[in-house]
């Protein structure tokens, strides 16, 4: 069936998902791969509400119960000084909160991510969010930008692109970041 073919395509990682995010600071190097494993810490609610993923160093994977391998590719597309930048992210593995946990682990949490440390816009002191203030929404700045997959019947390559949500579009306007200024797939060799 078509549904089974699509499910298999996702399971076998034959799809390509690119996310866009605004993050605190600017990573160095500007492009790279994050290979920290993830382990789940359950929340305090009756149904485990508030669960959070914690990163596990690759050397500790074998000795950390419940740890699962996780890999994220990232590329810096633009920046606003040293305070924030526009990232493209590919979850090579598809773990819960993977992108959010990985970006926080390397010191560049996603803007608006209260769970993983990216809610610093309110910091009026020396935090990354100082001087950004009310112009930037406190909502999570993570967006599933594109999905590329093979059509299950015709086998043609499909590229699906979603526009930025309103709160992120306002942020992009504030920083004068234009989606038309970057390639659809910044991970292609000729762009990097």
Regions found by a protein language model. Name each.
Residues 1-192:
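RNA pseudouridine synthases
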């Amino acid at each position: 069936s078509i549904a089974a073919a699509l499910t298999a395509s996702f399971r076998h990682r034959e799809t390509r998902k690119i996310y866009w995010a605004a993050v605190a600071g600017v990573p160095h190097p500007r492009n790279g791969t994050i290979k920290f494993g993830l382990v789940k810490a359950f929340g305090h609610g009756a149904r485990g509400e508030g669960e959070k993923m914690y990163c596990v160093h690759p050397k500790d994977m074998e000795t950390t119960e419940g740890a699962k391998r996780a890999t994220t590719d990232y590329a810096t597309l633009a920046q606003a000084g040293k305070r924030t930048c526009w990232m493209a992210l590919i979850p090579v593995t598809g773990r819960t909160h993977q992108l959010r946990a990985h970006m926080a682990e390397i010191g560049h949490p996603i803007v608006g991510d209260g769970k993983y440390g990216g809610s610093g816009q309110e910091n009026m002191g020396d935090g990354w969010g100082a001087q950004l203030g009310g112009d930037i929404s406190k909502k999570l700045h993570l967006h599933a930008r594109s999905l590329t997959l093979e059509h299950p019947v015709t086998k043609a390559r499909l590229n699906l692109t979603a526009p930025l949500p309103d709160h992120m579009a306002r942020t992009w306007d504030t920083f004068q970041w234009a989606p038309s200024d970057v390639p659809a797939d910044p991970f292609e060799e000729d762009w990097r």
